[in-house]
Regions:
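DNA polymerase processivity clamps
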Residues: 1-77, 84-190
């Protein structure tokens, strides 16, 4: 929780989420542990949300519920800024049409290989936008051709965990940016 610029950043070590535009009642950076409390329906549906802080704790009040998180003073948050660069640094962008985004979010779970380690898919961004998947027992590849979507920039073929692609879609992103096939994909909504 970055008080100086009103930024909330979170990571699980594989994915990062940075949201800005918050007014926090402190000016320094505060690291708190991850918690599953925010997936609770009563917390997500809260109308009134407020924050408070003591020397050792952050308090988040969501309607009648309060979550207390102990400040982790001896730990540091990873420098994730390098992994969420400016859009201009992308060599390729996958632009998803709304209909294709909805379709991909639902279909990705049914593609082969969903239960394999890292739930892999290949994003083949050439003349078309194609999502490819194959299970270990399968000899042929299954293709999802997203006819209403397009690629901007260079042609690219990149492997990804399908759940990361789905998470981006569920967060409302319709542009996935790539610097190259080895760098992490990123989305921005500035």
């Amino acid at each position: 929780l970055r008080g100086a610029d009103g930024q909330i950043a979170a990571t699980d070590g594989q994915q990062a989420l940075v949201q800005t535009g918050f007014t926090l009642p402190w000016t320094d950076d505060v690291l708190v542990p991850a918690t599953g409390a925010f997936v609770a329906k009563v917390i997500r549906a809260a109308v009134q949300v407020s924050l408070g802080r003591s020397t050792d704790w952050i308090f988040i009040r969501a309607d009648e519920w309060t979550v207390a998180l102990q400040i982790e003073k001896d730990r540091r948050f990873p420098a994730i800024e390098a992994h969420v660069p400016e859009v201009s640094s992308a060599s390729t962008t996958m632009v998803l049409a709304e209909t294709d985004a909805t379709f991909l979010d639902q279909a990705a779970q049914r593609l082969p290989g969903a239960s394999e380690m890292n739930s892999p898919v290949t994003l083949d961004l050439n003349g078309a936008v194609v999502i490819r998947a194959k299970s270990g027992e399968q000899s042929s590849v299954t293709d999802l051709v997203l006819r209403n979507s397009r690629r901007q920039g260079d042609e690219l073929k990149v492997s990804s965990n399908r759940e990361y692609v789905r998470r981006a879609i569920q967060l409302g992103f319709r542009e996935l940016h790539f610097r190259d096939a080895e760098a992490p994909a990123f989305c921005r909504d500035d």
